[in-house]
Amino acid sequence: MSSALSETSLDLPPGFRALALRELGDAFAKAVEIAGEQGAGTLVWTRRFDLVEVAVVLEPEEPLVTARRAFFAGMSAAADALAAHCPPEKPMVFAWPDTILLDGGLVGGGRLGWPDGADEKKPPDWLVFGLMLRLMMPTAPAARDRTSLEAEGFEMLEPRELIASFARHLMVHFETWRERGFQPVG
């Protein structure tokens, strides 16, 4: 592995450890690969200028059937991170279940992974929530069904800022879930 776990490249909240991949890396696949050995709080991200790609390893304490709700906590954290950097009055919506739209255009989405063969009635060894957001496109899309953060007015947004913001919001959502139940999160 050419990159090492290093928290110095991102301003992450306590409990997170960062692993940066080169441009062509797949953050989600890498997080799934190392989830069992690295554990909860491992945040894998890809160093790209055109795309935010991040995946976080989670270790739920409830059965897989309900632990999958972590997906909604991840999507809510993504929305909160985007809202913190979003131009005023920019419409942002989710298209069920995993797509994020800005002003009607596809800008990104999330996904959730768990170990093959995990028992629905037992806590899985790990979950991985992955998020991908388009920062910029080389050319303007012909159709209005796709967009980027740059095209929607997120000027000069560094991927590292958005990833760190996502991690902070994710931590808040999981803490809320732990203290007050899932209802305030989902």
Each predicted region: which residue ranges?
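Active-site-flanking beta-strand signature of metal-NTP-handling nucleotidyl enzymes
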Residues: 52-57
